[in-house]
Structure formats: C-alpha cells, structure tokens
Amino acid sequence: MQVFYGLLLMFILCSTIHLSEQWCSTCLDLACGASRECYDPCFKAFGRAHGKCMNNKCRCYT
C-alpha cells in the first residue's frame, strides 16, 4: 500500500511540473504596459491575436 501512495505522489509531482512548463509555452519575452500591445506579437508568433499583458510580459492564448 505504501508503494501505491509513493507512486501516486510521484505522478502528481510530475504532472504539476509538466503543466507548469506548458503554461509558459505561450509567454513571450516582450515587455508590455497594456494588453493591446500584445495583439500583434501574439498574432505573429501563434497566428491568433488573443493576448494579455500579465506581470509586464505578454501572454498569448492559443
């Protein structure tokens, strides 16, 4: 039973790390002050003009 809980814990940790890597795949290393500044760079990078300025960096929604 302890082996099961150990494997479950490892699975949860690996899933969390994998999800955090996916979140940053849509972040652009571009300084911004407003969301409208992210529309053109997001369109050029991902083909969709869906973006938002978060923590002074552009985050694109694909």
Swiss-Prot record:
Top-rank taxon, per record: Eukaryota
GO CC terms, sorted: extracellular region
Residue numbers marked as site, Aromatic residue of the functional dyad: 61
Domain notes: Has the structural arrangement of an alpha-helix connected to a beta-sheet by disulfide bonds (CSalpha/beta).
Free-text tissue specificity from the UniProt record: Expressed by the venom gland.
InterPro entries: Scorpion_toxin-like_sf, Scorpion_toxinS_K_inh
Keywords of this entry: Calcium-activated potassium channel impairing toxin, Disulfide bond, Ion channel impairing toxin, Neurotoxin, Potassium channel impairing toxin, Secreted, Signal, Toxin
The name this protein goes by in its record: Potassium channel toxin alpha-KTx 12.1
Residues flagged as site, Basic residue of the functional dyad: 52
GO molecular function annotation: ion channel inhibitor activity; potassium channel regulator activity; toxin activity
Keyword Chloroplast applies: no
One Pfam family linked to the record: Toxin_2
Subcellular location: Secreted
Chief localisation class: secreted
Entry similarity comment: Belongs to the short scorpion toxin superfamily. Potassium channel inhibitor family. Alpha-KTx 12 subfamily.
Miscellaneous section: The N-terminal C2-C5 disulfide bridge unique to this toxin does not appear to confer stability to the protein. Negative results: inhibits with a low efficiency Kv1.1/KCNA1, Kv1.5/KCNA5, Kv1.6/KCNA6, Kv4.3/KCND3, Kv7.1/KCNQ1, Kv7.2/KCNQ2, Kv7.4/KCNQ4, and ERG/KCNH2, and does not inhibit Kv1.4/KCNA4, Kv2.1/KCNB1, and Kv3.1/KCNC1.
Signal peptide interval: 1-22
Main function: Potently blocks Kv1.3/KCNA3, Kv1.2/KCNA2, and Shaker potassium channels and inhibits high conductance calcium-activated potassium channels. Is potent against Kv1.3/KCNN3 (IC(50)=0.55 nM) and Kv1.2/KCNN2 (IC(50)=6.19 nM). It also stimulates the release of NO, IL-6 and TNF-alpha in J774.1 cells and presents a pro-inflammatory activity in mice.
Coiled-coil parts of chain: none
